[in-house]
Amino acid sequence: MTIAKELKQKSNEELVKLVIKLKGELLEYRFKLAHGELDKPHLIAKVRKLLAVVLTILTERKLNWQVEKDKYKLLSRKTNELIVNSWKQKLSTKPESKQETKKAEVKPKVESKPESKQETKKAEVKPLKQETKKVEVKPKVEPKPLKQETKKVEARIETKTKVESKPLKQEVKKVEAKKSVSKPQKPVKAKMIKTKEKKQ
């Protein structure tokens, strides 16, 4: 047998005592674990699972007991007599044949149809106006060409080598500076700082 089947055979009192015992063991194991004295930490998980099974069995029994109690509720004599009389009336009266009931229902419907046609009016339907928003499209701006053109400057490099017994002279290179035109800089505006003079 499994553990759950064995536990279901026990009475409620035995299960309550088992719950108290398991809660005590669980507290003891957790205390030992906190102090580092617990050698088998898997015992905590086993106790928790067993405790869950026992509590589940107890709640099932409690719910079943409440359902059974509500199901077989005793009724008073007056309510019993009313129920019995209503069933007797339903059984004693014979329903009319199906064809007779259909014919009776059809006649009033035919008479009521012309009246309903005269009373109906057509509803006027107005078309909905859709609001359209006008969007202004700005023309694309083409980039303007630069007013100042860049000037190309050629640089000449001359190298002279002289072989002499005198100390060596460094080679002379003449490089002309290239002129490059960049965007004109914006003039910097100086801001004046106003200071309040103390009144005397």
UniProtKB/Swiss-Prot annotation:
InterPro entries to which the protein is assigned, alphabetical: Ribosomal_protein_uL29 (IPR050063), Ribosomal_uL29 (IPR001854), Ribosomal_uL29_CS (IPR018254), Ribosomal_uL29_sf (IPR036049)
UniProt-annotated stretches for the region Disordered: 92-200
NADP as UniProt keyword: no
PROSITE patterns: RIBOSOMAL_L29
Biased composition (Basic residues): 186-200
Any GO BP: translation
Region spans: Large ribosomal subunit protein uL29: 1-107
Keywords: Ribonucleoprotein, Ribosomal protein
Compositional bias ranges of the Basic and acidic residues kind: 93-179
Highest taxon, organism lineage: Bacteria
GO CC annotations, alphabetized: cytosolic large ribosomal subunit
Coiled coil: none
GO molecular function, one term: structural constituent of ribosome
Region called Unknown, residue ranges: 108-200
Keyword Ribonucleoprotein set for record: yes
PANTHER family: 60S RIBOSOMAL PROTEIN L35/50S RIBOSOMAL PROTEIN L29 (PTHR10916), LARGE RIBOSOMAL SUBUNIT PROTEIN UL29C (PTHR10916:SF0)
Family, similarity comment: Belongs to the universal ribosomal protein uL29 family.
Protein name: Large ribosomal subunit protein uL29
Species this chain originates from: Mycoplasma genitalium (strain ATCC 33530 / DSM 19775 / NCTC 10195 / G37) (Mycoplasmoides genitalium)
